[in-house]
Amino acid sequence: MYKISLLIFILTLIVPTYILGSYNYKNNNIKYSFPKSVLVSKKSDTYFFNDLGFRLFQGNCLIGNIYTTFPSNKSIQLIRKIEDKFINVDFGGEITTVKIREGFSNSNGSIILIDLGWKSIEDIKNFFDKKFKISLILKGGQGFDLNNYFDTNSNSWNIVGISKALDEATKLCNNL
């Protein structure tokens, strides 16, 4: 599952990446790859194709991209109609707008990659501080009906240990 999420994220950036190594740090998956970056992911509490991921790139290891995926039983042709569109979401109690980056074919339909934005690692850690679990609720599409594309509108992740995993990922990134 993680390899699929990694592949999806990499293809979204149109960057050829080859895994150089990986390990687990207290239930957090950490991988590093080429071009030089470090990935941290948390498995969903709810769905198989819904990891919450963080990617840090060499050269600016203090900023990370946050992303997730949602499964859909809709065809890839239909999902492609909402690529680069925006969704209003509730992420950890904060209302914000995120972007649908891309859709990918899956044996059961499609996988939708959602970009939750770029944040400093310290801001991410502060946002997750004292939380054991975080949820993402899709509120509404801008110019489209979510129900026509998404099978579910929410997901959650256990984020215990994520701050230490991000610290470890930052150290790895700085040593790339």
Where are these regions (language model features)?
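A generic "folded-domain core" signal
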Residues: 17-176
